[in-house]
Amino acid sequence: HARAKWLGPMPKKGDSCMTKRATCAVAEKSGARAYNSAMLIGPNGLIAVYRKAHLFSDEKNLFSKGNTPFEVHDIGGVRIGMMICFDWFFPEAARTLALKGADIICHPSNLVLPYCPAAMLTRCLENRVFAITANRIGTEERVKGKPLKFIGQSQIAAPDGKVLYRASEAKEEARVITIDVEKARNKNLNELNNIFKDRRPELYKG
């Protein structure tokens, strides 16, 4: 998956809550298996690993299906969940993280389909969470004769479905955005509708 580039030194003790935490995607080897994984890293090292649940296209020939649940981790009072790339196509991924209390969904990606930037706005709106999608730019030919072109457009999206920042399609960018996580904890749309309390899971079974 995407190679991780450090934007600065590794986190160290004494750093503020979110300034020295990092999420990156890696190819993880575990025994005889390989997983498309995301790591959450903090001042004391590795916090958590999530293994991609939904493999896309030729990834099925390279990686095993992820066997870790969608979990939420408290980082200095901010609740972080992770999903990877094509996981966005399955609404259950973001909904599970939201139901477990995520304020922010970290979403490292190698997106080649054009739909995700707009779709993630819906994921944020329907779950009232923030989402940070970090995507690649450029091209790569993993399988001979089948080049991949990445769409760029890394973005930060808000619980109201609005784009706080979206990067370009063709150049590397870094941006710092200040958010209020309390907006992700208010699940009320109006005086009468709460998106979680109004759920009818008894009617949703397939």
How should each PLM-predicted stretch be described?
Residues 3-18, 89-175:
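CN hydrolase (nitrilase-like) catalytic-core segments centered on the catalytic cysteine
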Residues 23-28:
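Short beta-strand-to-loop element that shapes/binds the nucleotide-sugar donor at the catalytic cleft/hinge
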Residues 29-100, 109, 115-122, 150, ...:
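Active-site catalytic loop in hydrolytic enzyme cores
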Residues 41-42, 157-158, 177-179:
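Short beta-strand-to-turn element immediately C-terminal to the catalytic PLP-Schiff-base lysine
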Residues 45-48, 162-164, 184-185:
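Short helix-loop capping/hinge motifs at secondary-structure junctions, enriched
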Residues 56-62, 173-176, 180-185:
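Short, surface-exposed linear segments at secondary-structure transitions and domain or protein termini
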Residues 183-206:
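A conserved C-terminal secondary-structure "cap"
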